């Protein structure tokens, strides 16, 4: 069905197409028509960060920034949903145009800039959602006019506001579209920031009587030495998990494309190799007690399998959905299932 809808959608401005897709999804969900338009996703129970997931394929942050489409998105078969990025105060984001579709490359360049209605609006939306289908992650960031020296205040405020409603919280330090944000990944800065957030997490756990996992979302553009340094900090601070990776400011395989010079983060198929290398390096430098989510460039089931082979416990997709539609979710689940079955069969044959 999506293959019929996509050509019409792609005649629209990219950001307008995004909005139309979400409105159409909501209409289909509330009318009861969504099951007729999507394929059933078979369960593949998975555990990570101490949470149970109906399957290991989730939606990455960015599609539903304000938590207004949670139930409809879960109905597409995702094992978990991550909403946001949300910030303490509402902000409009960067000037338009700020979202660019590269159809032949199955890629998108965005410089959205954390446009959102603010964490209080998100909390109200989450409180009104049913979300019984799987874990809900909430991705938090800082406002663009908050100096890095005060960034921990923004992250702590958001963490305190979403803690009671989230199944896990992601600390977004890696968007390339907020000036200076990625500097927070520098080793000593990262150590101080995560230390403060871990203290807040422990205080909130005592207050609410439950531990909500805290994940760190990393950039794909770090050098090997920077990745290793970040891994040391993440291990020392005993974070619950890591998401690898966000979008890239490099332009792999796109040098001749007319949109390659647009500022912003690149996602989609060209990011797959780069993000998977970062994922694999983090896996080799972090203990198995720290689960990883692999995201970046997943456009087919084989891509999801590659993330799992590189050490991911879970995967997320977003840009791939723009080009493949909701069927990508089930395709990824089945690819991971086949990989797990093959691995299990191999172990049995060697015993």
Swiss-Prot record:
* Subcellular localization, as worded in the UniProt entry: Cell membrane
This protein's membrane topology, according to the annotation, is: Peripheral membrane protein
User: Into which family does the record put it?
Assistant: Belongs to the dihydroorotate dehydrogenase family. Type 2 subfamily.
Q: Where does substrate bind?
A: 65, 110-114, 172, 177, 246-247
The main enzyme category here is oxidoreductase
What protein does this entry describe? Dihydroorotate dehydrogenase (quinone)
Organism classification: Bacteria, Pseudomonadati, Pseudomonadota, Gammaproteobacteria, Lysobacterales
Active-site residues per Swiss-Prot or TrEMBL entry: 175 (nucleophile)
**Reported function:** Catalyzes the conversion of dihydroorotate to orotate with quinone as electron acceptor.
Binding positions (FMN): 61-65, 85, 139, 172, 217, 245, 268, 297, 318-319
Cofactor binding mode, per the note?
A: Binds 1 FMN per subunit.
What is the superkingdom listed in this entry's lineage? Answer: Bacteria
- EC assignment: 1.3.5.2
Record's GO cellular component terms = cytoplasm; plasma membrane
Q: Which residues form a coiled coil?
A: none
Subunit architecture:
Monomer.
Keywords from the named record: Cell membrane, Flavoprotein, FMN, Membrane, Oxidoreductase, Pyrimidine biosynthesis
> What SUPFAM superfamilies does the entry give?
FMN-linked oxidoreductases (SSF51395)
Cofactor(s) needed for function: FMN
Q: Could you tell me what reaction this enzyme catalyses?
A: (S)-dihydroorotate + a quinone = orotate + a quinol
């Amino acid at each position: 069905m999506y293959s019929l809808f996509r050509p019409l959608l792609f005649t629209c401005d990219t950001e307008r197409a995004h909005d139309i897709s979400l409105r159409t999804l909501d209409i289909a969900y509330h009318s009861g028509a969504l099951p007729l338009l999507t394929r059933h996703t078979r369960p593949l129970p998975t555990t990570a960060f101490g949470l149970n997931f109906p399957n290991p394929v989730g939606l990455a942050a960015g599609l539903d920034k304000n938590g207004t489409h949670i139930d409809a998105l879960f109905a597409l078969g995702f094992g978990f949903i991550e909403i946001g990025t949300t910030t303490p105060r509402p902000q409009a984001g960067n000037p338009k145009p700020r979202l660019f579709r590269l159809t032949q490359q199955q890629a998108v360049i965005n410089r959205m800039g954390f446009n959102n209605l603010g964490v209080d609006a998100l909390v109200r939306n989450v409180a009104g959602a049913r979300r019984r289908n799987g874990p809900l992650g909430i991705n938090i960031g800082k406002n663009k006019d908050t100096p890095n020296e005060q960034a921990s205040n923004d992250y702590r405020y958001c963490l305190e506001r979403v803690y009671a409603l989230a199944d896990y919280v992601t600390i977004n330090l890696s968007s390339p579209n907020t000036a200076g944000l990625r500097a927070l990944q520098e080793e000593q800065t990262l150590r101080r920031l995560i230390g403060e957030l871990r203290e807040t997490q422990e205080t909130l756990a005592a207050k609410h009587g439950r531990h909500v996992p805290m994940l760190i979302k990393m950039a794909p553009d770090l050098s090997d030495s920077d990745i290793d340094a970040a891994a040391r900090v993440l291990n020392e601070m005993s974070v619950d998990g890591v998401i690898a990776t966000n979008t890239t400011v490099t332009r792999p395989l796109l040098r001749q494309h007319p949109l390659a010079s647009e500022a912003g983060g690149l996602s989609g198929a060209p990011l797959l190799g780069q993000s998977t290398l970062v994922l694999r390096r983090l896996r080799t430098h972090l203990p198995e007690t720290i689960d990883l989510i692999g995201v970046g460039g997943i456009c087919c089931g084989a891509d999801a399998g590659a993330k799992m082979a590189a050490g991911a416990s879970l995967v997320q997709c977003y840009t791939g959905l723009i080009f493949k539609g909701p069927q990508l979710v089930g395709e990824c689940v089945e690819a991971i299932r086949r990989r797990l079955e093959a691995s299990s069969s191999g172990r049995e044959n060697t015993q």
